[in-house]
């Protein structure tokens, strides 16, 4: 009896651009041999809106409201780096109080980013319930943002050259502390439900392994890099804002797989809580002071009229001209390094404005780590990268 030859030609399958697990309008052209992934070609650009060219035709204050539409899970990070670039180029100082307020907003955004990663990632691997839990906590962060900026998810439009748009309202720091007290036990709850769940562990351990040298050579950043054994965090490396004032640790793992990336993000949320608590206690002007009221009551000789107690160094005029020169500035977002290359031409608009998105770089390694895995593992590996197509395509 002759044996039938069952081997077939490789099959090309399209995932996306409209697929629930694509995390936006991403299209993957996957070549399969049975259930094994032979090749993968990401097709991007469906959400390209020309953000860099828009920036080159707007003043800085005009462009800030645009940036949270790139990565709607990291709007504060993009606002921060967009104002940091002209600040450093023009050597504009930032008051200590404004720097602390910025750190508070950035760390809240880091937690919100990781929560919005955690829920869909677990849904991708088959756990639907945590998706509802994470929005319970995010709702409290939205409330804090709304109290300080007037907006909840995107278009906070809060960062300004030299500081922030407005001081924190009275009682905001107490509400932020309440959130920290509430959210700490919730992380423990997530760990009990997820981390040692045998089904979850067997589903993602050993998937999408990236070695230390690979991670560096592919220019990965953020949790993708730190999960591969490289404790590189720009908050420690570049010493920007006032992060050196706080006691916190860099979260990192050695395994380099999907589970390690999950562990890094969980630990980063704990470290963000440590920073938030310290910032609430150490902010210049006191933790419960209404600085503006004290300044007005005590007159111009009040200590609260000093530079470090301001929320903005000097309101930049609409005719503020970006000086000649070029500069690259960067910061650590929830997804990794986001950076701005700015080239000034002594004009109100920049001559060149290049945006480096963290998830855009991290996505490039996807075809490399997918090869040899099963088709069912595509969603888990892609989900562990944490991409938002608005910032990938820009």
Swiss-Prot record:
Its EC number is 7.1.1.-. It is found in: Cellular thylakoid membrane. SUPFAM superfamilies: HydB/Nqo4-like. One of its GO terms (molecular function) is quinone binding. InterPro entries: NADH_Q_OxRdtase_suD, NADH_UbQ_OxRdtase_49kDa_CS, NDH1_su_D/H, NiFe-Hase_large. It catalyses: a plastoquinone + NADH + (n+1) H(+)(in) = a plastoquinol + NAD(+) + n H(+)(out); a plastoquinone + NADPH + (n+1) H(+)(in) = a plastoquinol + NADP(+) + n H(+)(out). Signal peptide: none annotated. It is an enzyme of class 7 (translocase). Coiled coil: none annotated. One of its GO terms (cellular component) is plasma membrane-derived thylakoid membrane. PROSITE patterns: COMPLEX1_49K. It is a peripheral membrane protein. Keywords: Membrane, NAD, NADP, Plastoquinone, Quinone, Thylakoid, Translocase, Transport. One of its GO terms (biological process) is photosynthesis, light reaction. It holds the Pfam family Complex1_49kDa. Belongs to the complex I 49 kDa subunit family. PANTHER family: NADH DEHYDROGENASE [UBIQUINONE] IRON-SULFUR PROTEIN 2, MITOCHONDRIAL (PTHR11993:SF10), NADH-UBIQUINONE OXIDOREDUCTASE 49 KDA SUBUNIT (PTHR11993). NDH-1 can be composed of about 15 different subunits; different subcomplexes with different compositions have been identified which probably have different functions. NDH-1 shuttles electrons from an unknown electron donor, via FMN and iron-sulfur (Fe-S) centers, to quinones in the respiratory and/or the photosynthetic chain. The immediate electron acceptor for the enzyme in this species is believed to be plastoquinone. Couples the redox reaction to proton translocation, and thus conserves the redox energy in a proton gradient. Cyanobacterial NDH-1 also plays a role in inorganic carbon-concentration. NCBIfam families: PRK06075.1, PRK07415.1. This is NAD(P)H-quinone oxidoreductase subunit H. It comes from Synechococcus sp. (strain WH7803). The gene is ndhH.
């Amino acid at each position: 009896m002759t044996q039938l030859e069952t081997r077939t030609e490789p099959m090309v399958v399209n995932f996306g651009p409209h697929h629930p697990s694509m995390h936006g309008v991403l299209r993957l052209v996957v070549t399969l041999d049975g259930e094994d992934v032979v090749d993968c070609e990401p097709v991007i650009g469906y959400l390209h809106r020309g953000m860099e060219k828009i920036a080159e035709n707007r003043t800085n204050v005009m462009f800030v409201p645009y940036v949270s539409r790139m990565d709607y899970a990291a709007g504060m990070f993009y606002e921060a780096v967009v104002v940091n670039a002209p600040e450093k180029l023009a050597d504009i100082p930032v008051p200590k109080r404004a720097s602390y307020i910025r750190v508070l907003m950035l760390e809240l955004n880091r937690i919100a980013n990781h929560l919005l990663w955690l829920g869909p990632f677990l849904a991708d691997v088959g756990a639907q319930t945590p998706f509802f839990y994470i929005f319970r906590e995010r709702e409290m962060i939205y409330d804090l943002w709304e109290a300080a900026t007037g907006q909840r998810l995107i278009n906070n439009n809060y960062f300004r050259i030299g500081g922030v748009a407005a001081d924190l309202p009275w009682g905001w720091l107490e509400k932020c502390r309440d959130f920290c007290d509430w959210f700490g036990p919730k992380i423990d709850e997530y760990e009990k439900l997820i981390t040692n769940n045998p089904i979850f562990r067997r589903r993602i351990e050993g998937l999408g392994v990236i070695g230390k040298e690979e991670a560096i050579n592919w220019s990965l950043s953020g949790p993708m890099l730190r999960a591969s054994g490289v404790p590189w965090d720009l908050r420690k490396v570049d010493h920007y804002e006032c992060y050196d004032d706080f006691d916190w640790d860099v979260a990192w793992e050695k395994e380099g797989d999907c589970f390690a990336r999950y562990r890094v993000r969980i630990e980063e949320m704990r470290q963000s809580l440590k920073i938030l608590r310290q910032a609430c206690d150490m902010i210049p002007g006191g933790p419960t002071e209404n600085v503006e009221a004290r300044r007005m009551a005590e007159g111009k000789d009040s200590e609260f009229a000093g530079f470090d107690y301001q929320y903005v160094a000097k309101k930049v005029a609409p005719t503020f001209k970006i000086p000649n020169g070029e500069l690259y500035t960067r910061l650590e977002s929830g997804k990794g390094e986001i950076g701005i290359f700015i080239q000034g031409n002594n004009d109100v608009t920049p001559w060149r404005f290049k945006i480096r998105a963290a998830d855009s770089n991290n996505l490039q390694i996807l075809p490399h780590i997918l090869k040899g895995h099963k088709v069912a593992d595509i969603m888990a590996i892609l989900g562990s990268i944490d991409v938002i197509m608005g910032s990938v395509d820009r």
